[in-house]
């Protein structure tokens, strides 16, 4: 496998190796083909790119900092740890990078209504935000379980004018919300734009979302060059569907000296049935329009994912991650709920930063690795979102621990 083959995809059929593709209902096929054409045209249009750059700068607040986490570095006693501060974006996470790109595309295509799925609620909030900014009605599909554990984000979406549809099917989480959003799209194909929140779904979504998120890695390269005069030695990011990770990784895939680590949600442990680690505990299959690694039972039925973090609670992973796993360019590991919580508390106390539980999975892996690495090793962790939304989850967990004590 030559280095130049790590960033080839997808091909014309939306495939990264054997992963990805367009597995959609016949009624949707013209729509995804049209979307792919429109996206290719937009990418080549200087006006579109100029407008995107304007909103990235003046609305999202980019570039965000690459911050040297000095006290965490001292605490670990090894590698020099940097945080790419995606939690400082408008709306508090990386999700808005993608939403602003897709809403500009929707506007360009003359669509009059936005729909989206959300798990932790951050993509829902970012979608509701851009819908408000561009005066478009917006419907968010959200699992009933997630609504329960993400009340603050539900209220934010309502404040921004979105309609929230609770999904009670299945486990009432992200997978089920995505199923309902796809049903809506089939029914309202003419005027509706489906704003997918991660690097999954039928082609062109995995590539399009990656491209809109790739600003994370591009900024990181320039910022580290300015600070240290060289490339990072390692990159660490959490992976649910995997958009913050693809955003950071893509820029560096052809740099053989850069070690890349994706961190899946290990839940209670990958050896149990309560985790969301599709690559470490799943097998290839088809879900939500693409072929990728999925959590499945012996009969090929999708099984329930579990993570303390609502944003990682998905039984699949973006197809480009599946490809990078198979060609061994990226190392995918898992972190348990407890390890993520420990890293969450450490980051709060050492850096005065309250990270999202999703990001805490990446932080936990960084804290594990850093002590074994030399002091001149440059490690970049993607701080994908802030932890305000997770206060109730952490409070409940701490209360449960106190009861057991």
From Swiss-Prot:
CDD domains: Trp-synth_B. One of its GO terms (molecular function) is tryptophan synthase activity. InterPro entries: Trp_synth_b_CS (IPR006653), Trp_synth_beta (IPR006654), Trp_synth_beta/beta-like (IPR023026), TrpB-like_PALP (IPR001926), TrpB-like_PALP_sf (IPR036052). Tetramer of two alpha and two beta chains. PANTHER family: TRYPTOPHAN SYNTHASE, TRYPTOPHAN SYNTHASE-RELATED. It catalyses: (1S,2R)-1-C-(indol-3-yl)glycerol 3-phosphate + L-serine = D-glyceraldehyde 3-phosphate + L-tryptophan + H2O. This is Tryptophan synthase beta chain. Belongs to the TrpB family. GO terms for cellular component: cytoplasm. NCBIfam families: trpB (TIGR00263). Its cofactor is pyridoxal 5'-phosphate. The beta subunit is responsible for the synthesis of L-tryptophan from indole and L-serine. Pathway: Amino-acid biosynthesis; L-tryptophan biosynthesis; L-tryptophan from chorismate: step 5/5. Gene3D superfamilies: 3.40.50.1100. Keywords: Amino-acid biosynthesis, Aromatic amino acid biosynthesis, Lyase, Pyridoxal phosphate, Tryptophan biosynthesis. Its EC number is 4.2.1.20. It comes from the Bacteria. It holds the Pfam family PALP. HAMAP family: Trp_synth_beta (MF_00133). The modification N6-(pyridoxal phosphate)lysine is found at residue 95.
